Design a protein with these regions (language model features):
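Charged, alpha-helix-forming regions
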Residues: 1-226
Length: 226
């Protein structure tokens, strides 16, 4: 179905699905906490699966791989220890180097360091959209989890303010600048590294899901901003 032939209601449902998936990915790439394994409980995962299906994609098998992996452990606490260990190895302290740094500046900036020019650019886009960094977020603004959450926020704000044409136009430009000019330029390389180097199914599967979704996002944005 082309964008031109969709009804307003269909476009809104697609936007909701996109926001749900970005929020889910943000949660998966955040530092693991006690609630993360529970994200895959049957009742909680259904919203994600429905959103995935609405976009014409199938995540059932991928989610089953994660839930099967989680059931190997006697409880969520044990699974969480494994997630925390792998998160640290992939994103923080692997030797001799971090295999998948989760920051845009490492991929977009010539220096390939954290807290680079791209970090400041991401923070400026957050500010332009009226969003500040939460006091509960203890990382760098261009962390992949923060950027996925920001993408979800932009889409949700457009839905909430759909009767405010000025706000919608501003958010649409920010979304274009952020997704096309920033997130989609570096996330594929990052996700490829995660899929290649992760030693547990959780991050392998989530990285593959994110890559599949972002291919669809690229196609969607090319149509919208043709």
């Amino acid at each position: 179905m082309t964008d031109e032939k969709r009804t307003v209601g269909e476009n809104e449902r697609i936007a909701i699905a996109r926001a749900v998936i970005y929020r889910f990915l943000s949660r998966c790439f955040s530092h693991p906490d006690k609630d993360l394994p529970g994200l895959f409980d049957s009742a909680r995962i259904e919203e994600f699966l429905q959103s995935w299906r609405y976009l014409g994609l199938d995540a059932e098998e991928a989610v089953a791989r994660i839930t099967n992996w989680l059931t190997r452990y006697p409880d969520y606490g044990t699974a969480l220890l494994e997630l925390d260990k792998e998160y640290t190895r992939l994103f923080i302290t692997a030797y001799p180097k971090v295999v998948a740094p989760p920051y845009s500046s490492v991929y977009l900036d010539k220096e390939r360091l954290i807290w680079g020019k791209s970090t400041a650019e991401a923070a400026k886009l957050y500010e332009a959209a009226g969003l500040g960094i939460s006091e509960n977020f203890h990382d760098i603004p261009d962390h992949i989890a923060a950027e996925f959450e920001f993408a979800s926020y932009l889409i949700s704000e457009q839905l909430r303010d759909r009767d405010n044409s000025t706000r919608i136009t501003a958010l649409d430009q920010i979304q274009k600048d952020f997704l096309i000019g920033h997130l989609l330029r570096w996330s594929p390389e990052f996700l490829s590294r995660v899929a290649e180097f992760s030693q547990i199914p959780f991050y392998q599967v989530v990285a593959d899901l994110a890559r599949e979704f972002l291919v669809l996002e690229t196609q969607h944005l090319e149509k919208v901003h043709h």
